[in-house]
From Swiss-Prot:
<dbReference type="InterPro" id="IPR005912">
    <property type="entry name" value="Pus10"/>
</dbReference>
<comment type="similarity">
    <text>Belongs to the pseudouridine synthase Pus10 family.</text>
</comment>
<keyword id="KW-0694">RNA-binding</keyword>
<dbReference type="Pfam" id="PF22023">
    <property type="entry name" value="Pus10_THUMP_arc"/>
</dbReference>
<keyword id="KW-0413">Isomerase</keyword>
<feature type="active site" description="Nucleophile">
    <location>
        <position position="269"/>
    </location>
</feature>
<keyword id="KW-0819">tRNA processing</keyword>
<dbReference type="GO" id="GO:0000049">
    <property type="term" value="F:tRNA binding"/>
</dbReference>
<dbReference type="InterPro" id="IPR039894">
    <property type="entry name" value="Pus10-like"/>
</dbReference>
<dbReference type="GO" id="GO:0031119">
    <property type="term" value="P:tRNA pseudouridine synthesis"/>
</dbReference>
<feature type="domain" description="THUMP">
    <location>
        <begin position="71"/>
        <end position="200"/>
    </location>
</feature>
<dbReference type="InterPro" id="IPR020103">
    <property type="entry name" value="PsdUridine_synth_cat_dom_sf"/>
</dbReference>
<feature type="binding site">
    <location>
        <position position="406"/>
    </location>
    <ligand>
        <name>substrate</name>
    </ligand>
</feature>
<comment type="function">
    <text>Responsible for synthesis of pseudouridine from uracil-54 and uracil-55 in the psi GC loop of transfer RNAs.</text>
</comment>
<dbReference type="InterPro" id="IPR048741">
    <property type="entry name" value="Pus10-like_C"/>
</dbReference>
<dbReference type="InterPro" id="IPR004114">
    <property type="entry name" value="THUMP_dom"/>
</dbReference>
<dbReference type="Pfam" id="PF21238">
    <property type="entry name" value="Pus10_C"/>
</dbReference>
Length: 452
């Protein structure tokens, strides 16, 4: 019985009018047709939606039995078997002019099978699908959206991502995850190849640097920029090892990864040790084919290989946000410095000078780093400065200060670029002979986003 509600009739008429306008553009498969009405109705695929609308149009034409309805059947015929039966026309559905066959079930199956093959040997449980459209497909879709005038469509790539994702999940047992995928499956429709982007692993921990003479991270040769030259012995590096490189090997092997990227909470000088509880860091593991790592075993292996040089502890899995947190968190740091004076100083005078250091210090960029740091004045606080050992020409002190304060220049004054300085207060030259970082604080446990 026809609806007595004029609004219902108007909506149905508007839907069929839009559908006819789309069909007049050329033969269109059920998926591409249904996708133009994707926001209407739930619990069905676009293919089912498109097939249902085509069936509704055939039934509507049967009811009307008019020239207009026969014209609608002719528009349907190239892509609807029921319309061809009504018209008495033989043949099969013509190729879809919009997707050029990319939305056909067998094509989606093929893409899913390729993805599952590419995922073999990669340890993961969560994935996301992303589609790269060819230029022609993008142009066809743009024409359809412009001329079809449907207000209820969704993009073709969204449907491909969803439908191929369902098939991958069914075939592999892995789960789609829009927010935190371990791999991203890239479908390249121009040539049909499938590429797997493995998301990084992030491991938080602390390191202790037990020897002097090497940097925190890989340092390209200043002369050749890393290409290799006489100065660096054709290694491309200023130093032959670093904290980064020392711990890299065991991590790359354990995760079957391509590389690592090291993110530290600041860095100590090359000639300084990092002692105490260690410095917070995050290692970004690049393209790990294994993710289920035993971090206790990894810690032990790193410490075994780096024995006497570097030691790591407190390894946990974290998410990407920890990189920014570790790099940007401002920690108070405690240093132990062995100082040498140009002339003997009195112990009480030294203690007095140390107490007067407490407070704010104005530091212009030190001469030794001016080639790689902006030339500006920084204001940092010294929270404590205490004498630990004293022998006239040498002293050992501990200094607790803000992150970013240059302790060597706090002692020497750097020709007046740091004020006040210990040398200025003593009216005597002073320099740091040995420097150790003995505490860096750390990211509060409440801020650490652990990944189980």
């Amino acid at each position: 019985m026809p609806s007595e509600n004029p609004t219902d009739n108007c909506i149905a008429s508007d839907l069929i009018s839009t559908a006819v306008r789309i069909l007049r553009l050329g033969p269109i498969c059920d998926s591409c047709f249904g996708r133009q009405f994707a926001m209407l109705g739930t619990g069905m695929t676009n293919s089912e939606r498109g097939r249902s609308i085509k069936t509704l149009m055939v039934m509507s034409a049967d009811l009307q039995a008019s020239d207009e309805s026969r014209e609608m059947l002719r528009a349907l015929a190239p892509s609807c078997r029921q319309a061809r039966l009504r018209l008495g026309v033989e043949g099969d559905d013509e190729n879809c002019w919009v997707c050029l066959g990319q939305m056909y079930p067998e094509r989606l199956e093929e893409l899913a099978d390729r993805a599952v093959d590419e995922l073999k040997g990669i340890e993961c449980s969560r994935f996301l699908v992303g589609t790269f459209m060819s230029g022609l497909l993008a142009e066809n879709e743009e024409l359809l959206l412009a001329d079809g005038c449907s207000r209820h469509a969704e993009p073709m790539k969204s449907e491909i991502n969803r439908e191929v994702g369902k098939l991958i999940a069914l075939k592999s047992g892995k789960q789609p995850d829009l927010n935190n995928p371990e791999v991203v499956v890239h479908l390249h429709l121009s040539d049909g190849h499938v590429e797997i982007q493995i998301q990084p692993l992030y491991i938080y921990g602390r390191y202790r640097k037990l020897q002097r003479g090497f940097p925190q991270t890989r340092w390209p040769c200043r002369v050749c920029g890393g290409r290799g030259c006489e100065r660096c012995g054709n290694t491309g590096r200023m130093y032959q090892e670093s904290v980064d490189e020392l711990i890299r090997g065991p991590i790359v092997e354990a995760a079957d990864a391509e590389d690592t990227v090291f993110h530290g909470a600041g860095r100590e000088d090359i000639d300084a040790r990092m002692l105490g509880s260690g410095r917070p860091f995050v290692v970004e593991v690049v393209r790990p084919r294994r993710r289920d790592l035993d971090l206790n075993a990894l810690r032990d292996e790193i410490n075994r290989r780096c024995s006497g040089k570097v030691e790591v502890s407190d390894l946990i899995f974290v998410d990407k946000s920890m990189v920014e947190m570790v790099k940007n968190e401002r920690f108070e740091k405690t240093y132990e410095a062995l100082i040498e004076f140009s002339v003997p100083v009195e112990e009480e005078k030294l203690k007095s000078a140390l107490s007067r250091l407490i407070g704010f210090v104005e530091q212009r960029t030190p001469t030794r780093v001016s080639h790689r740091r902006a030339d500006k004045v920084r204001r940092r606080a010294v929270h404590s400065a205490e004498l630990e050992e004293f022998s006239g020409r040498t002293a050992r002190i501990t200094v607790r200060c803000d992150s970013g304060l240059y302790v060597k220049e706090l002692i020497s004054g750097d020709a007046g670029r740091t004020r006040p300085s210990l040398a200025e207060l003593l009216e005597s030259d002073a320099r740091v002979v040995e420097l150790d970082v003995i505490d860096v604080g750390g990211v509060p446990n409440a801020k650490i986003t652990r990944i189980s």
